[in-house]
């Protein structure tokens, strides 16, 4: 089955019984609706499972100079999950969770962080050493049409990648690009800057995590909806419901909403829990020591 934007558009038209040759909804319109429903309906539904879908982290080396850090730009809801400090640069087993404070609490604690606007502020001062990991839920990339990506067909190790067609106009020398996997959940495996781009070739100094069949896209774009494959039918149905609403088809809208509700109910057991045989265990978190802020 084709899960690229091209395939999703075809599935939506079949489910909504929309003729292929109609002019009411263009492919661009349908992709816009896919992105709206993905971010506004499907992502919140998946997050409500509370099974750490989309969880990732940014890692920042500490040197005693940085007291404030921007919340990652691609964090869903512009919020974070937690912050941990790895006190060893070589052993990830030595870490502590940094407590979140409010401005009214800072005088009662020897150290932590608080949120001010879109920034994370360390208190009482910068941390001298270690690796700070900011865990957050990453927003799925924007679904784009086939005119904005190319498929890797040949890899010249640590030199370049060659695509099956010429690179699209949005990918040029110096462009920020993403390499997207061709297997679900279609993660972005590499975020990098394109070297010299010529026809179907992109020069890259590191190709270690790229495979034939992966997709080359502009930054924060993807041929796919970057969600579990089992939730793709929900996304398709939600777009169908939106179409019925736009067309003023009251009967179709009501039927579509009932179908979506049933599909969502059936789907919930597929995405949660993510581990069936082992319940979550709650343990005492590692605690910070005062020396971290000395």
Placement of each model-derived feature along the sequence:
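Short, structured beta-strand/loop micro-motifs enriched in basic residues and often containing a Trp
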Residues: 156-162, 198-199
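Residues on the solvent-exposed faces and adjacent turns
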Residues: 165
């Amino acid at each position: 089955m084709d899960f690229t934007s091209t395939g999703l558009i075809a599935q939506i038209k079949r489910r909504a019984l929309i003729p292929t040759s109609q002019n009411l909804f263009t492919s661009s319109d349908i992709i816009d609706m896919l992105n709206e429903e993905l971010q506004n309906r499907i992502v919140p539904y998946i997050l409500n499972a509370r099974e750490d879908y989309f969880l990732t982290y940014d890692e920042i080396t500490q040197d005693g100079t940085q007291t404030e850090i921007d919340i990652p730009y691609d964090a869903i809801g512009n919020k974070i999950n937690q912050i941990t400090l790895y006190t060893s640069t070589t052993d990830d087993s030595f870490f502590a969770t940094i407590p979140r404070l409010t401005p009214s609490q800072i005088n009662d604690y020897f150290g932590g962080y608080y949120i001010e606007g879109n920034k994370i502020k360390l208190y009482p001062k910068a941390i001298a050493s270690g690796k700070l990991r900011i865990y957050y839920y990453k927003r799925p990339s924007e679904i784009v049409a086939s005119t904005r990506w190319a498929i890797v067909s040949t890899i010249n190790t640590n030199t370049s990648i060659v695509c099956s067609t010429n690179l699209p106009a949005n990918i040029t020398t110096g462009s920020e690009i993403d390499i997207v996997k061709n297997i679900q959940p279609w993660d972005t495996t590499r975020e990098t800057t394109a070297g010299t781009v010529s026809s179907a070739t992109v020069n890259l100094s590191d190709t270690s995590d790229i495979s034939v069949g992966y997709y080359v896209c502009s930054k924060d774009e993807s041929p796919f909806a970057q969600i579990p494959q089992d939730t793709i039918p929900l996304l398709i149905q939600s777009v169908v419901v939106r179409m019925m609403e736009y067309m003023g088809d009251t009967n179709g809208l009501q039927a579509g909403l009932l179908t979506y509700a049933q599909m969502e109910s059936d789907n919930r057991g597929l995405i949660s829990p993510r581990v069936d045989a082992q319940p979550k265990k709650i343990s005492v978190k590692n605690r910070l020591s005062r020396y971290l802020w000395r």
